[in-house]
Each structure stands twice: as structure tokens, then as C-alpha cells.
A protein has these predicted regions:
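N-terminal ligand-binding/catalytic initiation module
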Residues: 2-154
Length: 154
């Protein structure tokens, strides 16, 4: 007999089967532009990227026009307070962060990527977030234990 979740009445086996079916995990990346011809590929990558690169270098706000930044959220955790399960580590938090990412997509059409930081050092977590924050239009902090979560949020 498989163990049932108290919350949704799904067995652990059903949940594991859901996560492993088809492609593993719950998120994937797809192109918002056509990539059917050599020209498309050249515009999407090299040499076509040179034009928006130069424009963004002159005016960083143009990153919102020429890239996905404005519709991209980082869902970040260190896994120190996973959904009532406790501190199970950053990698174990990945299914939760992927789940939050698909909720962003499903209910707000916001693209999101999960980022698990393998550290319990508040300064290290803050530094990592600061260093990657320019890539994203938003940062969602998730399942970071108190009191560190309040320090990181500030």
C-alpha cells in the first residue's frame, strides 16, 4: 500500500509518476521567435544578436524590449524550509521551485526559472541573488527558513 498525502489524497507513487512522466521535471524552454530557416537562426544568435547587444549597452532599459527580462522571474530557494518538510537542502527543493515556476506560467503567463542556491550562509545567498538579479524582471524567494528569509528579503 502506498502512502497517501494528507493534503491532496494522492499517493507518493502517483506524485512520483507525475514528475517522471514524459520529460523529467515540469519546466522547459521554448523559443518565442521562429527558428525554421538559417536566416532565423542567424537573427536569433550570431550575427543578429549584435544589434540588440549594442542598443542595450547604450541603454540598459532596452533589455526589457529586446529580451525576455520583463517577463522572467527567478524562483529562488536554498531548501532550508521546504513546504513543512524542513531543511532538506537546495536540490530537494527543486520540484517545489519548478512547481512555482509552472504556476507563474499557467496563471499569469510569466516565464520563470528555478534557481537553487546550495548555501545556508545569508551573505552568500544575498550575494548570489544580487549577482544574477539583472537577468530577471522579478525575484521570488521561496522556502528559505526564518530568520534568514527576512534578512535576504531586505
Amino acid at each position: 500500500m502506498t502512502k497517501k498525502s494528507k493534503i491532496d489524497h494522492y499517493s507518493d507513487k502517483e506524485a512520483l509518476d507525475f514528475h517522471i512522466a514524459g520529460k523529467s521535471g515540469k519546466i522547459e524552454i521554448s523559443s518565442s521567435k521562429p527558428l525554421t530557416t538559417k536566416r532565423d537562426l542567424s537573427l536569433a544568435y550570431s550575427p543578429g544578436v549584435a544589434a540588440p547587444v549594442k542598443e542595450i549597452a547604450k541603454n540598459p532599459d532596452l533589455a526589457y524590449d529586446y529580451t525576455s527580462k520583463g517577463n522572467l522571474v527567478a524562483v529562488i530557494s536554498n531548501g532550508s524550509a521546504i513546504l513543512g518538510l524542513g531543511n532538506l537542502g537546495s536540490l530537494a527543493s527543486k520540484p517545489v521551485m519548478e512547481g512555482k515556476s509552472v504556476l507563474f506560467k499557467r496563471f499569469a503567463d510569466i516565464d520563470s526559472i528555478d534557481i537553487e542556491i546550495n548555501s545556508n550562509n545569508t551573505d552568500s545567498i544575498i550575494e548570489t541573488i544580487k549577482n544574477i538579479s539583472g537577468t530577471f524582471g522579478g525575484i521570488n524567494l521561496e522556502d528559505i527558513a526564518a530568520p534568514d528569509c527576512f534578512i535576504v528579503e531586505q
